[in-house]
Amino acid sequence: ERIVAEIARFGVTRRVSPYLMNEPFLDKTILDKSRYIARHVPGCKVVITTNAGKLTREVVDDIVKDNPFRAIYISMQGIEKGPYESTMGGSLVFEETKRNVEYLMEQRNKHLPGLKIVMTMIKTSAIDAESAVRYWKSLGAESKYTVLENRGGNLPGFNELNVGSKRVFKDCTRLFKHAYIMFNGDMVLCCTDYYKTMVLGNVGETSIYDVWNSPRAVELRRNFIKGDLRDNPLCAKCVISGSS
């Protein structure tokens, strides 16, 4: 509640996504939390990204009753069972996920025409991203694919999955635009910092404003612009698909 109050007080936040390194719908209270944010920070967009594995009919029906989201992004690698399940991993089953997404779209079309649904995926050697994008667009969803990245060096299979050339992600804008806050209040430099190698501070001990504007955070951003990554191993290791 204190974090939401701070966001509301400054009035400059365009988007709040109440999750980071997890599947948000594993949290049984995610809709209540999202509604709280939407009520107390009415000027911002509440946006969620999900793999749709837990986006069941019951959850979708609950969203329809009182929708807090401006947009729902669904991460779904491809539109074929084998490549999808091998890429997504875990216990996700292609038919179940596809059924969940189609029910969401059906209910959106009936009851929530203003809710934006975007199907997203990463272009890799394992899936036919172009065909998947065409399929979802044919059903009325927005759809796109993005280029593969090694997530600050945290994706060991990058070279096998990469299509084409690769380069250092030196034009990234994440560290200038987004504050990534973990479950314990630690603000990390990037959404790819799974192991908390670049912790800027803790918003529970101070505030979002203080951590974002701390000398360490400011210096890291300035050095990134200069191309000096000596004290920033996360960005130094980050490689994306494509040429400079």
Label for each model-derived stretch:
Residues 173-175:
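Short, small/polar residue-rich loop motifs at catalytic or cofactor-binding pockets
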Residues 181-184:
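Short, acidic, Ser/Thr-enriched surface-loop or helix-capping motifs
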Residues 1-152:
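Conserved glycine-rich "GG(E/T)P / GGGxP" loop and the immediately following alpha-helix
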Residues 177-179:
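Hydrophobic alpha-helical transmembrane segments of multi-pass membrane transport proteins
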Residues 99-102, 106-116, 134-170, 186-187, ...:
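C-terminal accessory region of radical SAM enzymes
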